[in-house]
Amino acid sequence: DMDFETAPAVQEAIRERAAHGVFGYTLIEDDWYEAYQNWWKIRHNFEIPRDWLIFCTGVVPAISSIVRKMTTAAEKVVVLTPVYNIFFNSIYNNGRNILESPLKYENGAYSIDFEDLEEKLADPQTSLMIFCNPHNPVGKIWDKETLEKVGDLCVKHHVLVLSDEIH
């Protein structure tokens, strides 16, 4: 919604790009990789190898790709419910089974039912947990102790954690 005409140079650049005929993400520039590597190096003094980085067109396609690549058909994926409904789609659409671990709601606050969660993680068919922090839709920001406990349980039961922390 612009109140003025687009600059002729911009119009011409759009025409040139449209003439190319390919509108997907065809080439990922080195700058893209370097931006991520530099961010982690500056903020966390951690060097990420380039081959750890994979370009995705969004969070939802990334989650679906991870579910597909890191699990096999008929394996189980744990989610803490209620949860962002797209997680269900990413699991079901890839032929995986969902295990719901309902959050507890007591005294106006949500918490993880660790007894139930461990039972679900201990299932030999469980290979992945999709974790959301802050939790969507309840808005809970999990504290360090909770995160460590979830991590410890996943390590104990050899379950990979996919952590969605976009918000």
Where are the model-predicted features located?
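Short, solvent-exposed loop/turn segments at secondary-structure junctions
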Residues: D1-F4, W32, V60, Y84-N85, ...
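Generic structural signal for small/hydrophobic residues in well-ordered secondary structure
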Residues: I14, Y36, L53, V77-V78, ...
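Conserved PLP-anchoring active-site segment centered on the Schiff-base-forming lysine
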Residues: K69-I91, E118
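A short helix-loop-beta submotif of the ANL/AMP-binding
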Residues: N93-L99
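Active-site phosphate-binding strand-loop segment of PLP-dependent enzymes
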Residues: L103-H167
